[in-house]
Amino acid sequence: TQMCLHILRYFKGRKIIMQYQSTRNKTVFVSAAEAIKQGLSPEGGLFVPERIPMLIKDEIMALADKTYRERAFFILSKYLTDFTEEELKNCVDKAYTKEKFGTDTIAPIYKLNSGTYFLELWHGPTCAFKDMALQILPHLLTTSMKKTNETDEVVILVATSGDTGQAALEGFRDVDGTRIMVFFPNNGVSEIQKLQMITQEGNNVGVVAVKGNFD
């Protein structure tokens, strides 16, 4: 154990490149930006990190005193090692704002009683927990496109039967270089979900009701 701690402290602060491999082809490695841009590997697999970053106890304990944005930056920096510090901070700062989440805390923790706490993930613009991921994804994607020298417009196609469609629409709304089209079953979502989607604001969004089911 002591040897592991010495090794971790030795490498702390050094740039260790994280690569991603397909769940269907473990011989091919790509950068984080390339994995984000592609979404799926050519074989249809998912891109997963080649390893889980190791943290020492002091680093983990220090996270408790950080803001949500600071924690997000710290954790993302361990996985998206080809992003610069400025690029990551820009993505985090654009995604997690008080204007979007109604609070600087972003994801407040509510104490019910001794030993019982609730993590509130409904403060995002659509009141769905999926806002936590879909607010930052567009910025990570557009940054990845620039880093891999792609100039084409990104078109996002979404099929949804619930909260994902609205959270995706709100996340990509008016993000430069992107368009998003969401398809949903006409009789397969709640009235509130339908109204949320068909009244979505934004110059780059579109919604289509489909006769049929989600599958």
List each language-model region with its residue ranges.
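PLP-dependent amino-acid enzyme catalytic core
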Residues: 6, 14-215
